[in-house]
Amino acid sequence: MNFIDEVKIYIKGGNGGNGCVSFHREKFIDRGGPDGGDGGRGGSIIFRSNHHLNTLVNYRYKQHFIADSGENGKGSNKSGKSGKSLTLDVPIGTQIFAEDSDILLHDFTEDDQTFEIIKGGNGGLGNSHFKTSVNQAPRRRTEGEIAEEMWVQLSLKLLSDVGLVGLPNAGKSTFLSVVSAAKPKIADYPFTTLVPNLGVVYIDDEEFVIADIPGLIEGASQGHGLGDKFLKHIERCNVLIHLIDGSSEDVVADYNIVRTELESYSDYLKDKTQIICLNKIDVLTDEEIAEKTTQLQKITGKEIFPISTYTNTGITKIIKLALQTIKD
């Protein structure tokens, strides 16, 4: 399935039905009173979050959504039927913005939330409402209300507890496959991961969701590579696991590239707690591990965790630390 996280769609509520002009007709009664019924109310447009969805692909090709209009009123004081409301399902984490603006209309953070964005138009009044002492046979009625219409932008920000960040080939996809049941595409070339992947980690009778986004490169926050398109998906995370390729010739430069891109993208990411891991230590000597760990400690001022997704060295410790950070 295609991963689509940005769409623009047109939505319109159903118009109200028109009121009816009608007069009572019965045998032996020549001039019955007005009995025109009211028009039915138009249907509303409602968004609903659905945990079974993880992409906005349903709105990629169909982009116009209109609720049913109410039926016109009828004689014998019969009101028209109300139009059926239209419910549009979206993934949890979807945000709705007014067209071409930063005005947030709604943010879905839980399953089965609903948001009525457009109400259907009110039905018009039948002529029975306009009978007076001086006008016993009114031919007046009102038309149904025209419902609101608008274009909206849907933006999906995946909900996860932990975000994986690092340069391409830092080992993020392998890490995700080791700690969860997720099956991301894994290969030894940059940008194997082209879309975000989610995995659920189970440990000590608890669980949390971890997100792997495409690798960052220098200039990602300005649109280079793939990373800037998907950085928003880790803005909601509690903690970031920053993987650094231990086989790199300059681990400090690699760390600084990712740190700079996170800081440039948003304050949300800049202030996230990070667990910094020196990955792929299975290809390093003990001396190289010690040297690169020390280099990173000096530049970050934080503890560095040597790990290997190939031998599973240090993985459990990282997962437990991530869980504890989430709970704190």
Swiss-Prot record:
Class of the enzyme per the UniProt entry, highest EC level: hydrolase
Cofactors: Mg(2+)
Domain named Obg: residues: 1-159
Domain OBG-type G: 160-327
Record-listed GTP binding positions: 166-173, 191-195, 212-215, 279-282, 308-310
Pfam annotation, one family: MMR_HSR1
CC annotations in GO: cytoplasm
Gene3D superfamilies, alphabetized: GTP1/OBG domain, P-loop containing nucleotide triphosphate hydrolases
Ligand binding (Mg(2+)): S173, T193
Enzyme Commission numbers on file: 3.6.5.-
Chief location: cytoplasm
GO molecular function terms attached to this record: GTP binding; GTPase activity; magnesium ion binding
Gene Ontology biological process terms in this record: ribosome biogenesis
Keywords: Cytoplasm, GTP-binding, Hydrolase, Magnesium, Metal-binding, Nucleotide-binding
Subcellular location: Cytoplasm
Family: Belongs to the TRAFAC class OBG-HflX-like GTPase superfamily. OBG GTPase family.
Protein purpose: An essential GTPase which binds GTP, GDP and possibly (p)ppGpp with moderate affinity, with high nucleotide exchange rates and a fairly low GTP hydrolysis rate. Plays a role in control of the cell cycle, stress response, ribosome biogenesis and in those bacteria that undergo differentiation, in morphogenesis control.
Record text on subunit structure and interactions: Monomer.
HAMAP family given in the database record: GTPase_Obg (MF_01454)
Name this protein carries in UniProt: GTPase Obg
Protein species of origin: Rickettsia bellii (strain OSU 85-389)
